[in-house]
């Protein structure tokens, strides 16, 4: 009888330890660097591969646009954050930064830094305060006016039929002439993805 009780207790303790081991807190403890250019669809959300595809297409089109390619000197552009017209949370700041950075690297366009206007105004006041030596003072009136506004929006359409899901993204970007208000350059990039709903196994 004592042997049976000991055996039962041993089994119970084993089960308890097993449950605690399975249900306890877990953490990612080992990692490695991955290739950022590799496309890997882990879920049905917008990802960095989608963003890169769109940015590459937009940049190539804007640089090839005749108003940019044939300009006597690089046009000056001010960029507005890309609008998110989807129901998904997408980092539009990163999208906008990626496009602007790639365009600057082409040396075909220049950008004025709109977000830093407040900081620049503070620096002008500081330069005029008398603590900065004359030859190194930076004065108002020398900033370059923008020739174009670069703006755009992301839209999406989702279709689900049974276990099948299709997601369609479209990014449209325009370069608007500051003087004439005409859209001189425009491009859109479409990304369509298919997913199949499957049972999640433990």
Task: Locate predicted features.
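Sec-dependent bacterial lipoprotein signal peptides
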Residues: 1-20
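Alpha-helix termination/capping residues and helix-transition junctions
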Residues: 16-19, 71, 143
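A structural "domain/chain start" motif
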Residues: 23-108, 200-202
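Amphipathic beta-strand/beta-sheet edge segments enriched in Tyr/Trp
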Residues: 23-30, 147-199
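Surface-exposed acidic, glycine-flexible loop patches that form ligand/cofactor-binding
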Residues: 66-71, 140, 161-163
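Short, flexible active-site-adjacent loop segments at beta-strand->alpha-helix junctions, enriched
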Residues: 83, 115, 179
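Short, solvent-exposed, polar/charged sequence segments at loop or secondary-structure edges
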Residues: 96-98, 106, 111-161
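Short, surface-exposed secondary-structure junctions/capping segments
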Residues: 130-131, 197-202
């Amino acid at each position: 009888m004592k042997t049976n009780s000991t055996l039962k207790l041993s089994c119970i303790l084993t089960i308890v330890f097993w449950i605690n081991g399975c249900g306890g807190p877990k953490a990612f403890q080992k990692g490695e660097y991955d290739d950022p250019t590799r496309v890997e669809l882990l879920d049905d959300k917008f990802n960095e591969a989608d963003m890169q595809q769109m940015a590459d297409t937009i940049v190539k089109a804007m640089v090839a646009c005749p108003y940019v390619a044939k300009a006597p000197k690089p046009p000056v552009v001010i960029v507005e954050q890309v609008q998110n017209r989807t129901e998904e949370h997408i980092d539009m700041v990163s999208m906008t930064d990626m496009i602007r950075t790639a365009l600057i690297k082409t040396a075909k366009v220049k950008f004025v830094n709109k977000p830093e206007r407040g900081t620049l105004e503070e620096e002008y006041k500081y330069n005029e305060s008398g603590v900065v030596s004359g030859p190194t003072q930076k004065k108002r009136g020398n900033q370059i006016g923008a020739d174009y506004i670069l703006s755009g929006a992301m839209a999406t359409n989702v279709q689900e039929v049974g276990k099948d899901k299709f997601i369609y993204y479209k990014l449209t970007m325009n370069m608007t002439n500051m003087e004439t208000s005409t859209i001189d350059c425009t491009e859109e990039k479409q990304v369509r993805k298919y997913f199949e709903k499957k049972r999640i196994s433990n």
